[in-house]
Amino acid sequence: MPYFHRVDAPRVLSMGLVALDVLCIAQEPERTSFRAGGTAGNVAAILGALGWPATLAGPAEESLAYELMLNDLTRCGVEYREMHRAAVPVIVEELEHYARHSFTFDCPACGKALPRYHRTYRADASSWVCEDVHTDVFFADRLSDEILELAQSARRSNAFIVYEPSDPSDAPWAPAMLALADMVKYSDERADGLSWLSDGDHLEIRTKGAAGLQWRWARHEIHQWQSMASIHVANVVDTCGAGDWLTSGILIGLLERGDTRATWSGVTAMEQVLRRAQQLAAWSCGYAGARGALYESGPAMARAIVQHLETSVMPDPLPESNAGFSCAACPMTS
Protein backbone atom coordinates (compact mmCIF):
# COMPACT_ATOMS: atom_id res chain seq x y z
CA MET A 1 0.00 0.00 0.00
CA PRO A 2 1.13 3.63 -0.44
CA TYR A 3 3.00 5.07 2.50
CA PHE A 4 0.26 7.49 3.54
CA HIS A 5 -2.39 9.82 2.13
CA ARG A 6 -2.38 13.25 3.70
CA VAL A 7 -5.28 15.49 2.88
CA ASP A 8 -2.86 18.40 2.52
CA ALA A 9 -0.43 16.62 0.18
CA PRO A 10 -0.05 18.31 -3.23
CA ARG A 11 -2.07 16.76 -6.04
CA VAL A 12 -0.12 15.86 -9.17
CA LEU A 13 -1.29 15.26 -12.73
CA SER A 14 1.33 13.56 -14.91
CA MET A 15 1.31 13.18 -18.70
CA GLY A 16 3.71 12.16 -21.44
CA LEU A 17 5.56 8.87 -21.78
CA VAL A 18 3.42 6.20 -20.10
CA ALA A 19 4.39 2.57 -20.67
CA LEU A 20 4.63 -0.96 -19.34
CA ASP A 21 8.19 -1.77 -18.29
CA VAL A 22 9.27 -5.38 -18.65
CA LEU A 23 12.33 -6.12 -16.51
CA CYS A 24 14.49 -9.10 -17.47
CA ILE A 25 17.45 -9.84 -15.18
CA ALA A 26 20.33 -11.92 -16.53
CA GLN A 27 20.98 -13.60 -13.17
CA GLU A 28 17.30 -14.54 -12.79
CA PRO A 29 16.13 -15.67 -16.24
CA GLU A 30 13.05 -17.33 -14.77
CA ARG A 31 11.75 -14.03 -13.39
CA THR A 32 10.05 -11.29 -15.41
CA SER A 33 8.71 -8.19 -13.66
CA PHE A 34 5.96 -6.00 -15.10
CA ARG A 35 5.69 -2.44 -13.84
CA ALA A 36 4.23 0.85 -14.99
CA GLY A 37 6.96 2.93 -16.57
CA GLY A 38 7.93 5.81 -18.77
CA THR A 39 9.07 9.06 -17.19
CA ALA A 40 5.53 10.36 -16.62
CA GLY A 41 4.46 6.97 -15.29
CA ASN A 42 7.40 6.64 -12.92
CA VAL A 43 7.01 10.12 -11.44
CA ALA A 44 3.29 9.54 -10.82
CA ALA A 45 3.94 6.10 -9.29
CA ILE A 46 6.72 7.31 -6.99
CA LEU A 47 4.76 10.29 -5.74
CA GLY A 48 1.59 8.22 -5.43
CA ALA A 49 3.38 5.55 -3.40
CA LEU A 50 4.83 8.26 -1.16
CA GLY A 51 1.41 9.67 -0.42
CA TRP A 52 0.57 12.29 -3.02
CA PRO A 53 -2.86 12.12 -4.68
CA ALA A 54 -1.57 11.24 -8.15
CA THR A 55 -3.37 11.09 -11.48
CA LEU A 56 -1.73 9.74 -14.63
CA ALA A 57 -3.22 10.21 -18.09
CA GLY A 58 -2.31 8.13 -21.12
CA PRO A 59 -3.33 5.45 -23.61
CA ALA A 60 -5.71 2.59 -22.89
CA GLU A 61 -6.81 -0.57 -24.67
CA GLU A 62 -8.06 -4.03 -23.77
CA SER A 63 -4.79 -5.92 -23.45
CA LEU A 64 -2.69 -7.71 -20.88
CA ALA A 65 -0.11 -4.93 -21.09
CA TYR A 66 -2.74 -2.39 -20.06
CA GLU A 67 -4.01 -4.60 -17.23
CA LEU A 68 -0.50 -5.20 -15.85
CA MET A 69 0.31 -1.49 -16.00
CA LEU A 70 -2.98 -0.51 -14.40
CA ASN A 71 -2.63 -3.06 -11.59
CA ASP A 72 0.81 -1.74 -10.73
CA LEU A 73 -0.36 1.87 -10.73
CA THR A 74 -3.23 0.93 -8.43
CA ARG A 75 -0.78 -0.61 -5.97
CA CYS A 76 1.09 2.70 -5.99
CA GLY A 77 -2.07 4.69 -5.27
CA VAL A 78 -2.27 6.26 -8.73
CA GLU A 79 -5.56 7.05 -10.47
CA TYR A 80 -5.31 6.35 -14.19
CA ARG A 81 -7.30 8.31 -16.78
CA GLU A 82 -7.70 7.28 -20.39
CA MET A 83 -6.70 10.02 -22.81
CA HIS A 84 -7.03 8.03 -26.03
CA ARG A 85 -7.59 4.52 -27.31
CA ALA A 86 -4.22 3.13 -28.29
CA ALA A 87 -1.82 0.34 -27.47
CA VAL A 88 0.17 0.83 -24.29
CA PRO A 89 3.88 1.17 -25.17
CA VAL A 90 6.01 -1.72 -23.93
CA ILE A 91 9.68 -1.21 -23.08
CA VAL A 92 11.95 -4.15 -22.23
CA GLU A 93 14.90 -3.48 -19.92
CA GLU A 94 17.56 -6.18 -20.02
CA LEU A 95 19.72 -5.88 -16.90
CA GLU A 96 23.12 -7.57 -16.97
CA HIS A 97 26.06 -7.83 -14.60
CA TYR A 98 27.83 -4.72 -13.27
CA ALA A 99 24.76 -2.49 -13.60
CA ARG A 100 24.79 -2.63 -17.38
CA HIS A 101 21.37 -2.34 -18.93
CA SER A 102 19.91 -1.98 -22.38
CA PHE A 103 16.46 -1.27 -23.74
CA THR A 104 14.71 -3.02 -26.58
CA PHE A 105 11.42 -2.41 -28.34
CA ASP A 106 11.21 -5.91 -29.79
CA CYS A 107 10.17 -9.02 -27.90
CA PRO A 108 13.37 -10.78 -26.76
CA ALA A 109 11.66 -14.17 -27.20
CA CYS A 110 9.94 -13.96 -30.59
CA GLY A 111 11.31 -10.75 -32.12
CA LYS A 112 7.88 -9.22 -32.58
CA ALA A 113 7.81 -5.42 -32.54
CA LEU A 114 6.37 -4.01 -29.32
CA PRO A 115 3.94 -1.06 -29.23
CA ARG A 116 5.70 2.32 -29.22
CA TYR A 117 4.80 5.79 -27.99
CA HIS A 118 2.63 7.87 -30.33
CA ARG A 119 1.67 11.50 -29.89
CA THR A 120 -2.12 11.11 -30.19
CA TYR A 121 -4.72 12.26 -27.69
CA ARG A 122 -8.43 12.80 -27.31
CA ALA A 123 -9.88 15.93 -28.85
CA ASP A 124 -11.80 16.81 -25.68
CA ALA A 125 -8.80 16.54 -23.35
CA SER A 126 -9.07 20.11 -22.08
CA SER A 127 -12.69 19.80 -20.95
CA TRP A 128 -11.89 16.44 -19.36
CA VAL A 129 -9.18 17.81 -17.09
CA CYS A 130 -11.00 21.03 -16.25
CA GLU A 131 -14.14 19.20 -15.14
CA ASP A 132 -12.68 16.22 -13.31
CA VAL A 133 -9.12 16.88 -12.17
CA HIS A 134 -7.91 19.63 -9.89
CA THR A 135 -4.14 19.63 -9.55
CA ASP A 136 -1.44 21.49 -7.67
CA VAL A 137 1.39 20.13 -9.82
CA PHE A 138 1.34 19.46 -13.56
CA PHE A 139 4.14 17.25 -14.92
CA ALA A 140 4.91 16.52 -18.58
CA ASP A 141 7.86 14.97 -20.39
CA ARG A 142 6.28 14.94 -23.86
CA LEU A 143 4.28 17.67 -25.56
CA SER A 144 1.32 17.94 -27.93
CA ASP A 145 -1.47 20.43 -28.58
CA GLU A 146 -3.57 18.75 -25.90
CA ILE A 147 -0.84 18.50 -23.28
CA LEU A 148 0.08 22.15 -23.77
CA GLU A 149 -3.58 23.15 -23.46
CA LEU A 150 -3.85 21.17 -20.22
CA ALA A 151 -0.69 22.81 -18.90
CA GLN A 152 -2.17 26.23 -19.65
CA SER A 153 -5.35 25.23 -17.83
CA ALA A 154 -3.31 24.07 -14.84
CA ARG A 155 -1.37 27.34 -14.83
CA ARG A 156 -4.61 29.32 -14.72
CA SER A 157 -5.43 27.32 -11.58
CA ASN A 158 -2.07 28.35 -10.10
CA ALA A 159 -0.51 24.88 -10.41
CA PHE A 160 3.26 24.36 -10.33
CA ILE A 161 4.30 23.38 -13.87
CA VAL A 162 7.13 20.89 -14.42
CA TYR A 163 8.57 20.11 -17.85
CA GLU A 164 11.27 17.50 -18.51
CA PRO A 165 12.28 17.89 -22.16
CA SER A 166 13.95 14.89 -23.78
CA ASP A 167 12.43 14.60 -27.25
CA PRO A 168 13.55 17.01 -30.02
CA SER A 169 10.14 16.58 -31.67
CA ASP A 170 8.63 18.66 -28.85
CA ALA A 171 9.94 21.69 -30.77
CA PRO A 172 6.55 23.08 -31.99
CA TRP A 173 5.23 23.34 -28.42
CA ALA A 174 8.43 23.83 -26.41
CA PRO A 175 8.64 27.66 -26.39
CA ALA A 176 5.11 27.98 -25.00
CA MET A 177 5.73 25.23 -22.43
CA LEU A 178 9.02 26.77 -21.31
CA ALA A 179 7.21 30.07 -20.78
CA LEU A 180 4.69 28.32 -18.52
CA ALA A 181 7.14 26.19 -16.56
CA ASP A 182 8.16 26.68 -12.94
CA MET A 183 10.74 23.89 -13.17
CA VAL A 184 12.62 22.53 -16.18
CA LYS A 185 14.89 19.51 -15.76
CA TYR A 186 16.88 17.77 -18.48
CA SER A 187 19.99 15.64 -18.89
CA ASP A 188 23.29 16.99 -20.13
CA GLU A 189 23.61 14.21 -22.69
CA ARG A 190 20.37 15.22 -24.41
CA ALA A 191 20.75 18.98 -24.19
CA ASP A 192 22.57 19.30 -27.52
CA GLY A 193 19.57 17.81 -29.31
CA LEU A 194 17.20 20.31 -27.71
CA SER A 195 18.19 23.41 -29.66
CA TRP A 196 15.02 25.22 -28.56
CA LEU A 197 15.98 25.26 -24.86
CA SER A 198 15.98 28.85 -23.66
CA ASP A 199 16.57 30.81 -20.49
CA GLY A 200 13.66 31.74 -18.28
CA ASP A 201 12.84 32.58 -14.69
CA HIS A 202 12.06 28.93 -13.87
CA LEU A 203 14.12 26.57 -11.75
CA GLU A 204 16.46 24.97 -14.30
CA ILE A 205 18.20 21.69 -13.46
CA ARG A 206 20.76 20.06 -15.72
CA THR A 207 21.75 16.55 -14.66
CA LYS A 208 25.21 15.24 -15.53
CA GLY A 209 25.13 11.61 -14.44
CA ALA A 210 28.12 10.64 -12.31
CA ALA A 211 29.33 14.25 -12.50
CA GLY A 212 26.36 15.48 -10.46
CA LEU A 213 24.11 18.33 -11.53
CA GLN A 214 23.90 22.07 -12.13
CA TRP A 215 21.03 24.36 -11.29
CA ARG A 216 19.95 28.00 -11.40
CA TRP A 217 16.77 29.88 -10.60
CA ALA A 218 16.44 33.35 -12.11
CA ARG A 219 13.14 33.97 -10.33
CA HIS A 220 15.11 34.01 -7.06
CA GLU A 221 18.02 36.00 -8.52
CA ILE A 222 20.25 32.94 -8.84
CA HIS A 223 21.40 33.49 -12.42
CA GLN A 224 24.74 31.67 -12.40
CA TRP A 225 24.97 27.91 -12.61
CA GLN A 226 25.42 26.26 -9.22
CA SER A 227 27.20 22.89 -9.28
CA MET A 228 26.61 19.92 -6.98
CA ALA A 229 28.63 16.70 -6.95
CA SER A 230 26.95 13.34 -7.24
CA ILE A 231 26.54 10.95 -4.31
CA HIS A 232 28.71 7.85 -4.35
CA VAL A 233 26.85 4.54 -4.39
CA ALA A 234 28.90 1.59 -3.16
CA ASN A 235 26.86 -1.12 -4.87
CA VAL A 236 25.14 0.09 -8.03
CA VAL A 237 22.62 -2.42 -9.36
CA ASP A 238 20.70 -0.32 -11.88
CA THR A 239 20.73 3.41 -12.63
CA CYS A 240 17.52 3.25 -14.67
CA GLY A 241 14.89 5.57 -13.21
CA ALA A 242 17.28 7.52 -10.98
CA GLY A 243 16.27 10.75 -12.72
CA ASP A 244 12.60 10.10 -11.94
CA TRP A 245 13.44 9.59 -8.26
CA LEU A 246 15.43 12.83 -8.35
CA THR A 247 12.44 14.71 -9.78
CA SER A 248 10.11 13.23 -7.17
CA GLY A 249 12.48 14.12 -4.35
CA ILE A 250 12.80 17.69 -5.56
CA LEU A 251 9.02 18.13 -5.75
CA ILE A 252 8.56 16.69 -2.27
CA GLY A 253 11.24 18.99 -0.86
CA LEU A 254 9.88 22.07 -2.60
CA LEU A 255 6.15 21.67 -2.37
CA GLU A 256 5.15 19.71 0.71
CA ARG A 257 5.46 22.90 2.73
CA GLY A 258 2.02 23.79 1.36
CA ASP A 259 3.10 26.51 -1.07
CA THR A 260 2.94 25.28 -4.65
CA ARG A 261 4.42 28.55 -5.93
CA ALA A 262 7.71 27.42 -4.34
CA THR A 263 8.87 30.35 -2.21
CA TRP A 264 12.21 28.70 -1.54
CA SER A 265 15.00 31.19 -2.06
CA GLY A 266 18.71 31.20 -1.45
CA VAL A 267 21.41 28.79 -2.51
CA THR A 268 21.69 26.99 0.83
CA ALA A 269 17.98 26.19 1.13
CA MET A 270 17.75 24.96 -2.45
CA GLU A 271 20.88 22.85 -2.17
CA GLN A 272 19.39 21.12 0.87
CA VAL A 273 16.35 20.16 -1.21
CA LEU A 274 18.52 18.98 -4.09
CA ARG A 275 20.90 17.04 -1.85
CA ARG A 276 18.11 15.03 -0.26
CA ALA A 277 16.65 14.38 -3.70
CA GLN A 278 20.09 13.19 -4.84
CA GLN A 279 20.24 10.85 -1.84
CA LEU A 280 16.88 9.41 -2.85
CA ALA A 281 18.05 8.91 -6.43
CA ALA A 282 21.32 7.32 -5.27
CA TRP A 283 19.42 4.93 -3.00
CA SER A 284 17.23 3.86 -5.93
CA CYS A 285 20.33 2.71 -7.84
CA GLY A 286 20.74 -0.18 -5.42
CA TYR A 287 17.70 -1.97 -6.84
CA ALA A 288 16.78 -3.55 -10.17
CA GLY A 289 14.37 -1.63 -12.36
CA ALA A 290 13.35 2.00 -12.47
CA ARG A 291 11.29 1.72 -9.27
CA GLY A 292 12.66 -1.51 -7.84
CA ALA A 293 13.24 0.16 -4.48
CA LEU A 294 9.48 0.33 -3.90
CA TYR A 295 9.16 -3.45 -4.29
CA GLU A 296 12.21 -4.45 -2.26
CA SER A 297 12.38 -1.79 0.48
CA GLY A 298 9.18 0.23 0.21
CA PRO A 299 7.73 3.74 0.43
CA ALA A 300 8.50 4.23 4.13
CA MET A 301 12.22 3.78 3.45
CA ALA A 302 12.03 6.31 0.62
CA ARG A 303 10.24 8.77 2.90
CA ALA A 304 12.90 8.38 5.58
CA ILE A 305 15.60 9.29 3.06
CA VAL A 306 13.95 12.30 1.46
CA GLN A 307 12.81 13.69 4.82
CA HIS A 308 16.12 12.84 6.52
CA LEU A 309 14.36 11.00 9.35
CA GLU A 310 16.57 9.85 12.20
CA THR A 311 14.28 7.08 13.45
CA SER A 312 14.67 3.54 12.16
CA VAL A 313 12.14 2.47 9.54
CA MET A 314 10.99 -1.05 8.82
CA PRO A 315 10.86 -2.09 5.16
CA ASP A 316 7.36 -2.11 3.69
CA PRO A 317 7.82 -3.38 0.13
CA LEU A 318 4.93 -3.12 -2.30
CA PRO A 319 3.64 -6.35 -3.86
CA GLU A 320 4.18 -6.78 -7.58
CA SER A 321 3.28 -9.04 -10.47
CA ASN A 322 5.98 -11.48 -11.51
CA ALA A 323 4.48 -13.43 -14.37
CA GLY A 324 6.31 -16.22 -16.11
CA PHE A 325 5.55 -15.44 -19.74
CA SER A 326 7.92 -17.07 -22.18
CA CYS A 327 7.21 -14.31 -24.69
CA ALA A 328 7.13 -10.68 -23.60
CA ALA A 329 5.26 -9.42 -26.67
CA CYS A 330 2.62 -11.87 -27.78
CA PRO A 331 0.59 -12.19 -24.55
CA MET A 332 0.64 -8.42 -24.14
CA THR A 333 -0.56 -7.46 -27.58
CA SER A 334 -3.06 -10.23 -28.18
Residue ranges of model-derived segments:
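Short beta-strand/loop segments at the ligand-binding rim of alpha/beta enzyme cores
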Residues: A154-Y163
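Short pre-catalytic strand/loop immediately N-terminal to key active-site residues, enriched for Gly-Thr
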Residues: E28-G37, A229-G241
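Conserved phosphate-donor
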Residues: L180-N235
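Histidine-anchored nucleotide/phosphate-binding helix
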Residues: T39-A49
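Structural alpha-helical scaffold elements that stabilize or flank donor/cofactor-binding regions
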Residues: C130-E131, A174-M177, L197
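Conserved N-terminal subdomain of the carbohydrate kinase-like
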Residues: L20-P29, L50-V137, A300-S334
